Amino acid sequence: MITRMSELFLRTLRDDPADAEVASHKLLIRAGYIRPVAPGLYSWLPLGLRVLRNIERVIRDEMNAIGGQEILFPALLPRAPYETTNRWTQYGDSVFRLKDRRGNDYLLGPTHEELFTLTVKGEYSSYKDFPLTLYQIQTKYRDEARPRAGILRAREFVMKDSYSFDIDAAGLKAAYHAHREAYQRIFDRLQVRYVIVSAVSGAMGGSASEEFLAESPSGEDAFVRCLESGYAANVEAVVTARPDTLPIDGLPEAVVHDTGDTPTIASLVAWANEADLGRTVTAADTLKNVLIKVRQPGGDTELLAIGVPGDREVDDKRLGAALEPADYALLDDDDFAKHPFLVKGYIGPKALRENNVRYLVDPRIVDGTSWITGADQPGRHVVGLVAGRDFTADGTIEAAEVREGDPSPDGAGPLVMARGIEIGHIFQLGSKYTDAFTADVLGEDGKPVRLTMGSYGIGVSRLVAVVAEQHHDELGLRWPSTVAPFDVHLVIANKDAQARAGATALAADLDRLGVEVLLDDRQASPGVKFKDAELLGMPWIVVVGRGWADGVVELRDRFSGQTRELVAGASLATDIAAAVTG
């Protein structure tokens, strides 16, 4: 196929968009692959759509290879199935809801577990029909509070979501591993650098869960890994290494001190080191109690106290994952006014217990550990408050931040921090959705068997940005051959009529060899054409320029930057095709 740039719907930009934060956002707009419509909404222009379709093709190849069958559901979905699973409420403000002219409720689908489950239930009734894997590549919608980074976090996006249905746990495990391996092949073919990390299931439900994260310093997802063992996990899924309990006998009694104006950890530590407590005090010796209000879907709001060592901050993502599917918010001044026993900056376990406030603490706060914490009165703290003797929490919670150097949960060494972009997520859902819809089939013994499910997603449109994020330089995009809009960008950098005719003939020869060609036949200067060729990022650039008169053309490798001259003879197209496919 030959596409002439003189006919292509394309306009490149020389300057970065003012609101673009990351490289992929800047380059995809500058190169004319996408255009913004509204916050979180983008149009796909011809070049961008070709990249998107190439990625879809790779995904279809690998999904079909593991026995997946493609279907397509509507994006506009009725309320009833989501009420059955309680996700109509759980999703809160993150979905787009609307009513038809008769007042019936609908949403724009964020995911389709309910529809897949109901469809399989309606079509199949025997164990003989399984195992089964269905998938779709479809536009999804989420009302992101802060869409950012172009198509990396948009309100409308393309996803591949697949679902496996099996009659037992062994079948689910096999389907899960088949998808895991298929995802590795997909991302390898797309030349994406990625890591597989343990993850939490969130609103999806289920048990085993892993994320595929594309390594990127601009990624929203923090993850950790242990270089000694290969352990890797999203920060939400990291389990804190719980220390051993300590003996309580012989520890000094807790003492309340007047600490003055010390509402912060820093001011409390400063006081402690001036108070001659007989030791040097650090923030790690203090117990910070954070109050939040929690609301379960469709339920009432309750107070919850989170206790963490004073040298740690509460991580919003870890806290949110631990409380899923509940919503939460920090207490404001009005909340403190309603609960006068909560003295801001001086909250301790005593008032929490006396007022029946649920209290969850970091796993490091084990019996026998001694703490400096609030005494529930302005300007007063208690020193030497011992867990298991002076206070007992209602449980533990993984809410404190994870840090570089923390011990790996497997005990093999320290954790190293990194950032990534989520490109895939696989879950062993189990029977969460088949329970909700009583999706049973007759087993081999004639008795009902409850189906078990797996859920597997890939961010298709996000992958366009991820590949651009990982494959670019200061000149522009550098698409891997698997996803590039065209195999070769053929630049006519010579106004001579014979050179133009030769370039056009070369394009036709390449086309006959199955090479897709973008032919820059515009009446523009060579400098403009070269800049556009580098910006657009085809893996190979062929230049028909001044050397044509001497029987020579240039072949440039966009990745390595290397240029070599080829003889413009009978084998020219074959030589270029060999380089492109080799």
From Swiss-Prot:
Record's catalysed reaction(s): tRNA(Pro) + L-proline + ATP = L-prolyl-tRNA(Pro) + AMP + diphosphate
E.C. designation(s): 6.1.1.15
One function term, GO molecular function aspect: aminoacyl-tRNA deacylase activity
InterPro entries per record: aa-tRNA-synt_IIb (IPR002314), aa-tRNA-synth_II (IPR006195), aa-tRNA-synth_II/BPL/LPL (IPR045864), Anticodon-bd (IPR004154), Anticodon-bd_dom_sf (IPR036621), Pro-tRNA-ligase_IIa (IPR002316), Pro-tRNA-synth_IIa_bac-type (IPR004500), Pro-tRNA-Synthase_IIa_type1 (IPR023717)
Broad class of enzyme this protein falls into: ligase
Crosslink position(s): Isoglutamyl lysine isopeptide (Lys-Gln) (interchain with Q-Cter in protein Pup): K173
Keywords assigned: Aminoacyl-tRNA synthetase, ATP-binding, Cytoplasm, Isopeptide bond, Ligase, Nucleotide-binding, Protein biosynthesis, Ubl conjugation
Family matches, as SUPFAM superfamilies: Class II aaRS ABD-related (SSF52954), Class II aaRS and biotin synthetases (SSF55681), YbaK/ProRS associated domain (SSF55826)
Short name of any one Pfam family annotated for the protein: tRNA_edit
GO biological process assignments: prolyl-tRNA aminoacylation
Family: Belongs to the class-II aminoacyl-tRNA synthetase family. ProS type 1 subfamily.
PANTHER family per record: MITOCHONDRIAL RIBOSOME PROTEIN L39/PROLYL-TRNA LIGASE FAMILY MEMBER (PTHR42753), PROLINE--TRNA LIGASE (PTHR42753:SF2)
Domain remark from Swiss-Prot or TrEMBL: Consists of three domains: the N-terminal catalytic domain, the editing domain and the C-terminal anticodon-binding domain.
Function recorded in the entry: Catalyzes the attachment of proline to tRNA(Pro) in a two-step reaction: proline is first activated by ATP to form Pro-AMP and then transferred to the acceptor end of tRNA(Pro). As ProRS can inadvertently accommodate and process non-cognate amino acids such as alanine and cysteine, to avoid such errors it has two additional distinct editing activities against alanine. One activity is designated as 'pretransfer' editing and involves the tRNA(Pro)-independent hydrolysis of activated Ala-AMP.
Protein's UniProt name: Proline--tRNA ligase
